[in-house]
Regions:
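Alpha-helical segments in soluble extracytoplasmic regions
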Residues: 2-79
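C-terminal amphipathic alpha-helix
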Residues: 2-14, 75-157
């Protein structure tokens, strides 16, 4: 469940990055790479499948909603040409940007819906763990980068 929530967080961060154009390194500017990492590194489909088993009596419904988040992100990879330069933050057309931002929004919303099928106590526990990890990361960053702020903080920050 934590990894599913991390994808939701990554969707928000990527959306802000696209809209602001602020990124620290070249890799972060590649939208297709970021979306691919959300799907593969966080094993979104596998984790949605696994977490849906917690939706007592509504596992299939939960799975269908969660798969919708996967499909929204997959569209970003499938819809555009295979060129690694087709979706760069600094060169993206307004039409492509609108499509990608909508897909990221849909994925985040479907994850929200997916989470409503799961036990609230477990969702809250996973969110608390993420908040704790993010706080540790922020403190570590502040210690190592005196005076610098995060370019793309966690949602709500």
């Amino acid at each position: 469940m934590v990894l599913v929530l991390r994808v939701q967080e990554a969707c928000s961060q990527e959306k802000r990055l696209i809209k602001s154009g602020k990124f620290k390194d070249v890799q972060r500017a590649n939208i297709k790479l970021a979306v691919n990492l959300m799907l593969t590194n966080y094993a979104l489909l596998d984790n949605v499948n696994q977490a849906s088993t917690l939706a007592r009596g509504r596992s299939q419904e939960a799975l269908n909603v969660g798969v919708g988040a996967v499909e929204a992100l997959q569209q970003v990879l499938d819809y555009f040409d295979s060129s690694s330069k087709s979706l760069k933050v600094d060169t993206i057309s307004s039409e492509k940007q609108e499509f990608v931002v909508k897909a990221l929004d849909v994925a985040a919303q479907r994850i929200d819906s997916f989470l409503t099928y799961l036990p609230a106590a477990q969702v809250d526990k996973a969110k608390a763990l993420i908040a704790y990890e993010n706080d540790l990361n922020l403190k570590e960053y502040a210690e190592q980068n005196k005076g610098e702020k995060y370019l793309n903080p966690t949602p709500g920050a």
